[in-house]
Amino acid sequence: MLLELSEEHKEHLAFLPQVDSSVVAEFGRIAVEFLRRGANPKIYEGAARKLNVSSDTVQHGVEGLTYLLTESSKLMISELDFQDSVFVLGFSEELNKLLLQLYLDNRKEIRMILSELAPSLPSYHNLEWRLDVQLASRSLRQQIKPAVTIKLHLNQNGDHNTKILQTDPATLLHLVQQLEQALEEMKTNHCRRVVRNIK
């Protein structure tokens, strides 16, 4: 699978052929550092002074490289696909090899950093349910409304917790229909592309 870069990202990466390969390698190190600790304007300013360019140019170059490395790592694209994705940018063969080496050296670490940044959401463990109906009452003059009680067991970071929910059957039926509709929508090509890019 090829990585598709927007025109903006191509513009950001267009700065890389203008600098030495050691500078590109340093930009790669800064890009991984950017993922670990966030942006550091002092590093951009120092590099900009050494290269006699604006700090925005350096920042855009690092951000473009960060995007290239993170998206490639996220999608776990192969060496060949990475080379083909970078080939479209029109860089020299030496720069393409350097970018490939940066990707191969850092992809495991980048995936680890991205997994740490992902939010930890509760996951389903078990479900118990009960239908409550009042069978008889002398004082009851309106129609009997049954209630569905649901006990939901969840796991989050090894901790177990329980949520108790209660609703009427009509609302539960509507909820089931909405969930089934969402599951059907997940089978569309658009949703599959989105999910593939999220991973």
UniProtKB/Swiss-Prot annotation:
The keyword Plastid does not apply. GO terms for cellular component: cytoplasm. It is found in: Cytoplasm. Residues 123-190 form the COMM domain. It comes from the Eukaryota. Keywords: Cytoplasm, Transcription, Transcription regulation, Ubl conjugation pathway. CDD domains: Commd2. InterPro entries: COMM, Commd2. Belongs to the COMM domain-containing protein 2 family. Scaffold protein in the commander complex that is essential for endosomal recycling of transmembrane cargos; the commander complex is composed of the CCC subcomplex and the retriever subcomplex. May modulate activity of cullin-RING E3 ubiquitin ligase (CRL) complexes. May down-regulate activation of NF-kappa-B. Component of the commander complex consisting of the CCC subcomplex and the retriever subcomplex. Component of the CCC (COMMD/CCDC22/CCDC93) subcomplex consisting of COMMD1, COMMD2, COMMD3, COMMD4, COMMD5, COMMD6, COMMD7, COMMD8, COMMD9, COMMD10, CCDC22 and CCDC93; within the complex forms a heterodimer with COMMD3. Interacts with RELA, RELB, NFKB1/p105, NFKB2/p100. Interacts with CCDC22, CCDC93, SCNN1B, CUL3, CUL4B, CUL5, CUL7. This is COMM domain-containing protein 2. It comes from Pongo abelii (Sumatran orangutan). The gene is COMMD2.
